[in-house]
Amino acid sequence: MNEPNSWVEWVDPELDVDEAAVPQPVVAVVGRPNVGKSTLVNRLIGRRQAVVEDVPGVTRDRVPYDAQWNGRQFAVVDTGGWEPDAKDRAAAIAAQAESAITTADVVLFVVDAVVGATDVDEAAVKMLRRSAKPVILVANKADNSSIEMEASALWSLGLGEPYPVSALHGRGSGELLDLILDRLPEAPKIVEDRPRGPRRVALVGRPNVGKSSLLNRFSGEIRAVVDAVAGTTVDPVDSLVEIGGEAWQLVDTAGLRKRVGQASGTEYYASLRTTSAIEAAEVAVVLLDASEVISEQDQRILSMVTDAGRALVIAFNKWDLVDADRRYYLDREIERELRRIPWAIRLNLSARTGRAVDKLAPALRRALASWETRVPTAQLNAWLTALVQATPHPVRGGRAPKILFATQAGAAPPRFVLFTTGPLDAGYQRFVERKLREEFGFEGSPIEISVRARKKLGPGGRGKAHG
C-alpha cells in the first residue's frame, strides 16, 4: 500500500514480481541533534544497534533497522541531527535525514521534552509540513510524570498531540509502538516458524519423464503406477518418504502436455490438479528427459513453478541413456533454453538405476534455505550503497534515478523493494538482481524485486509530491 501523494508503485513489467506483495513499511526517526533519536531507535527495535553517545552528530547517515511489534514487521530508519541552513558535514547529515523522510510512510519527530520547543524544532516542523508525511510528535526524555505534564506545551508546534516517552528507561515505548502500527499502512505479518512436519515437494514434468519411477525409487514400493504409456498418472499421489535421513512429503503429478486452457477432459482436470500441487508445495522438482531435446512444454512447466514463486530443482532424468554426443548438445540447450533461470539447482540422475539420486535431498535443502532467506535491512543497505557507488545507474536524458533505500518485503520467496527517485532501467534492475544473488546466494530460489519510485516534486515546496 502506498502513502497517498508520496510514492507511486512502479514495477518493471519484464520482471517476475508479485504485485500483491505488501512492502515492509518504513518509519523515519528525525529531529535536531542530541534529542535521543538513536536511543529511541534502540528502544523501538528491542536491541542496542544504533550508536548512542551524548554528543551531537554521532549518527551521520540514515541507518535502517528491522523492527517487530504485535506480530507486525517494519523498518526503522535512524537519522543524524537535522538543522536548517547547515554547512559542510552538517548539511550532508541534514540532507540524509530529508532523504529518509521521502522514503518513510510515517515520521517520528523527536523533541527534547525537558528543553521544550526550540527555533530549530520549529524550522523542522515547516520542513515536515512540506513533505506531506504523517508525523508523530515524540516528546523524549520524559523520565517522570512531572516532565510528562510539561510536554503538553509542545502542542504549540502544531503537529497534534505530543506523545511523551523515555527512550532511556522505556517509559511509554509500548504505547508509541501501538500508535506507529495504527499510523502505518498495512504492515506484513511476521511469518511464524514453519509448522513441524515434512517439507512438501511437487514432482512435475511432461508425460513419461520418470516422475513416478523416481517416487518409487524413494518409497520402496509401487506407490504410483508406472507404465511406458504417457499419461499413466492422473491424480496427484502423496507419499511420505525418507530421503537423506529426512522425511519428505512427495507429490507426484500428472504429466503436462498442453496449456491448461488448451487441455480438455481428463487432461484438463489433471492440469488443474498439478497447478494446485505446485501451489501447495514449497519446492518443486521439475524432471526433464535428458535423452530428449528440451521442449517448449518443459519450459512452460518451469514457468508454472517460477510463477508460483516456489523453490526449484531441475532433475535431468534418464542420464543412463545419455552418451557423449547428447551431453554436448544438452549443454548447448541448457545455455540457450534455461538462460532465464540460471539460479535453478540442476542434477543429473537416473531414477531407473539410482544414479545420483542421493544428491536430491541436499539440493532440496539448499533450495529451501535460499527460499526462506531474510537479509537484515542494515546489511542489505550497506551492500546496496557500495554497489551503487561502484556502478551508478546510467544517465538518461541528463539525469539518473537514485536508489535511496531498500528493504526485504518478505520471504518464501524473497521479495525486495527498492525506494528510488524514478523508474530504473530494466537492464540495471537485472544487474542489481544478479549482484544480489552473487552476494547473498539464493541458489534454487526465485527472488522478486519491485521499485517504489518517488513522484516528481511539485511547485509547492521542497519534499512535496503531487498526485
Swiss-Prot record:
Entry keyword set: GTP-binding, Nucleotide-binding, Repeat, Ribosome biogenesis
GO molecular function: ATP hydrolysis activity; GTP binding; ribosome binding
Record Gene3D superfamilies: 3.30.300.20, P-loop containing nucleotide triphosphate hydrolases
Pfam families, per database record: KH_dom-like, MMR_HSR1
Protein's GO biological process: ribosome biogenesis
InterPro entries: AAA+_ATPase, G_ENGA, GTP-bd, GTPase_Der, KH_dom-like, KH_dom-like_a/b, P-loop_NTPase, Small_GTP-bd
Occurrences of domain EngA-type G (ranges): 25-188, 199-372
PROSITE patterns in the record: G_ENGA
Residues engaged in binding GTP 1: 31-38, 78-82, 140-143
Residues the record lists as binding GTP 2: 205-212, 252-256, 317-320
rRNA-binding found in the keyword field: no
Domain KH-like: 373-455
Subunit and partners: Associates with the 50S ribosomal subunit.
Stated family: Belongs to the TRAFAC class TrmE-Era-EngA-EngB-Septin-like GTPase superfamily. EngA (Der) GTPase family.
Job description of the protein: GTPase that plays an essential role in the late steps of ribosome biogenesis.
Full protein name: GTPase Der
Gene: der
